[in-house]
Amino acid sequence: MSKIEKLIKVLCPNGIIFKTIGEICETITDYVAAGSFKDLSNNVKYLKEPDYAMLIRTTDIKSNFKGDKFIYINEAAFNYLWRVNLDKESIVLPNIGNCGEVYYLTPNDLPYKRCALATNSILVRSKQVNMKYLKHIFLAKDFQTQLKKIISHSGQTKFNKTDLKKLKIPVPPLEVQEEIVRILDKFGELEAELEAELEARKSQYEFWRDKLFEQNVKEKYIFEDILKSLKTGLNPRKFFKVNTVDAVNYYVTVKELGERNVRYWESKDKINSEGLQRINERSNLEVNDVLFSGTGTIGKVSLIEKEPKNWNVKEGVYILKPKKEKVIPTYLMYLMRSNYMKKLYSDYIVGSPVSSIPMKELKKIKISLPSLQEQERIVNILDKFDKLVNDISEGLPAEIEARRKQYEYYRNKLLSFEELVVNG
C-alpha cells in the first residue's frame, strides 16, 4: 500500500470532499477587474522601455521569458492593477485563447522585481489548499473535461470567472495534497533536467551548424542561380474560400512549418479541391522543395520529403526549388536555418508591423557554396545533431515526451478520487 493510500485510509476512509473553485480560492481575478475599458486605457499605458514594473503575458511565461519585446508599466499603473500584482505564489489560467493551459508562478520565477498579470488570463490563489496541488488538479483530465464544458468557441476560445468558480475539485487533507505534490514534482524535475540538456545540445548544434556554414568557401553564387525557381502560395481573396463545406485539404501557414517537416495536419484552415488546384498553379509544390517563411515570422524553414497530396501553402510562404546539380535540398534547408544566412537576408527585411523580405531581394543575395561532396558531408553531420535535438521519435525529445506521458498517467491516476457522499 502506498503512502497516499495509507493517508487516505486513515484521514478520509469514506471518500474525499469535493468543493467548488469559488469555495476554496480567495483570489479569482483578472486585469479587467480594475475598471472599465476607458478607465484601464486612462490609467495603464504600455511602455516599451524598462520602467517601474513589467506586465506579464502568458506568451512571456510560455517562452520562459526569452526575448526582448516585453511590456512595462509605470508605478501608478502598477498600483492601479493591485489585484493582479504577481507578488505571491500564483496560478495563471489563460481564459481567452489557449484555454486549458495552466501556469504556476512564484516571484522568484519572474524576470523583474515588480510584475502584474496582463489581459486574457485569470489569476487564482488559495490559502486553503496547497497551490502546487491546485496546479496539478487544474492540469488533470477530470478538471480539463469540466473546463471544456464552459469554454465558448465563438471566435477565440474563452471562458469567464463566474463559470470557473462553479467547477468542483477534490480537496483531500493537506497531508495527502503534499504527498501528491512530492510525487508529481519529481516528474517535473526530471523533465526540467532533460529540457536543460536539450537546450544545451541545441546550442551546441547551432554553434557547429553556423561554423560549418561560415567556412571560407571561395565559390560564390547569386542565390537565384542555385534555384530553379522561387515561388509563393496564394491567399483566398477572390480566388478561393477557406473552410467551405467541401473543404478537406489543409491550408498551410507559417505556423505549420516545423523544425524539418511541414506539420500540415495542425492547420486550423482547410480548402476544397478547387482551391488546392488554384494554389498549386502558382506554388507547384514538389518533393525536395524547401519552404521558407518570408513574411511575418521570418526564417522558419521546412523540407518537403513526401508528396504534398492534400495540402498547400498561403502567400508569404516561399517555395525554393533547388537546382540539384548545384545544391542538395537538405543542405539548402540547413543553409536557410543558419545564422550565416540570416545575417545575409536581414538587411533586406522591410515593413511594419508585419515584416517581410521581398523575393526579388532574396534572389540577389550572394552566398558561399561548397562542392556537392562537401555539402553531403555537412548534411550527414547536421542530420545526426538534428535527430538528437528535434526528432520526437528518438533522441532527447522522445525521452522528454515519454516522461511527460508518464507524468500525465500518474497525475490522472493520483488525482482521481471517490467523492464523499453526505447524506441529508
Placement of each model-derived feature along the sequence:
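Accessory (non-catalytic) regions of SAM-dependent nucleic-acid methyltransferases
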Residues: M1-L11, K413, N423-G424
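Non-catalytic DNA-recognition/assembly elements of restriction-modification systems
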Residues: V10-D39, K211-N235, E399, K405, ...
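Short amphipathic alpha-helical linker/capping segments at the junctions of internal repeats
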Residues: Y112-C115, L198-E214, T244, K309-V313, ...
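A short glycine-rich beta-alpha junction/loop motif
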Residues: K113-S121, S152-P172, N310-Y318, V350-S371
